[in-house]
């Protein structure tokens, strides 16, 4: 309770004092998402985008154009990303949006007045549990908790979908509440359930809103009475649990107060411990299935005392092989067959993070793609020069974070080469991802790519930090490990020594993993111990590894 209070009063310097005031954010780039008529992506925000924006609807955006008057439009639902905001427009606006020349849009702005005090609502709900002072959240955990440990692309979402479908087939009365940290995670599971089900999933509901056009037929609003159906599976973001619910003819029924037959928490590594504890101790007599990967991204919180805390740190679940959990030994279902990556890439992150216990579905013979004169292997290391006081090779600061100009420009050029060579011989869709540890580095690369002409429409590009890539995958992944200023004196505090961050970064690639990293002559390189560990593991399978210098490229 004390930590919730601190988090409630705290926040980063940029967001302190925001509650109760209007928040203004401007974006200097607006693009329609490829393949959609109603989804738009706003990029390069003037400030950080609050996560609670995902929990509100009817978001009004003001667009400024070079050739017409300003235009105000409302959007139904948002996906918050570190450098962008993904918005889905109402179907009623589709014709209006399609008539707009978006290349003439110079700015988009949003003024947020009706904020949701998520931490305050969580605090109130937690206090409503009536727990005694000094109540030990860890020692009172019980065996109603079960875990699914799902490393990257081991079929976790499919496993959850089949479990839900199986329960609906087995029990004539079955009410399930699914909670996940983001709209994206909610939508991914809902889509997988529809994909795996042989019937029409008449019992499947997405609470309040969805960012996916294909799921609009299962969205239910607060007036609905679906919670009284004999069979229902309601999927919601975890942040709504403390305060939201149904208020139709049946009266006001919070999600917290409805009697469910099972609670399922997905992508659990990203769920703050206080939110998870609320779910656990509110539904003490209900089976709770917790699914995720302890070695993926942890919650974003401000208070140092619980910054990296989640349900996995509480129960000490941090390994695949022979885990010993606390305070009791919980039931754990381990998923071990990874379906995404070529064996060389899969074995790299298996040895790095999962005790070498993953098996690999794909064949090493599947990938025969060539990129011109560049003889790439499944795993590729390209070191770049770092010189302390150099304007191009030195470590710079942008918005208080680390950037390295040469690695930005080099990444752009090798990206352009890969795209150009791919387009010569291939028409099928291909995805390229560029992941960086620091947001400004990713922003610089993305802004340059957005200005690059003649990128083929069949090449999908994603650029961001690891938070953008959680749960995602690309055929070709660039991992751009630009160095921080503190790697010589504060090695334990830098992102490049965060095992979870590096694990997410290297496990997104399907066919090619290209790691750009500081040259071994860089001052302080020996302190990049996680990168060195990855290199040592990779070189055990040297036949599937290529090393190039930037000059050679």
Please state what every model-predicted region is.
Residues 165, 173-263, 300-315, 366-367, ...:
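Conserved P-loop NTPase motor core of helicases/translocases
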Residues 18-143, 201, 207, 214-221, ...:
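Pre-ATPase regulatory/linker segments immediately N-terminal to the P-loop/RecA-like helicase/translocase core
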Residues 156-157:
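Conserved lysine of the Walker
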Residues 160-161:
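Post-Walker A alpha-helix
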Residues 171, 181-184, 239-241, 258-553:
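Conserved helicase motor core of SF1/SF2 NTP-dependent helicases
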Residues 153:
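Walker A (P-loop) phosphate-binding loop of P-loop NTPases
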Residues 146-149, 177:
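Short hydrophobic/aromatic beta-strand immediately N-terminal to the Walker A/P-loop
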Residues 3-25:
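Short Lys/Arg-enriched alpha/beta "domain-start" segment
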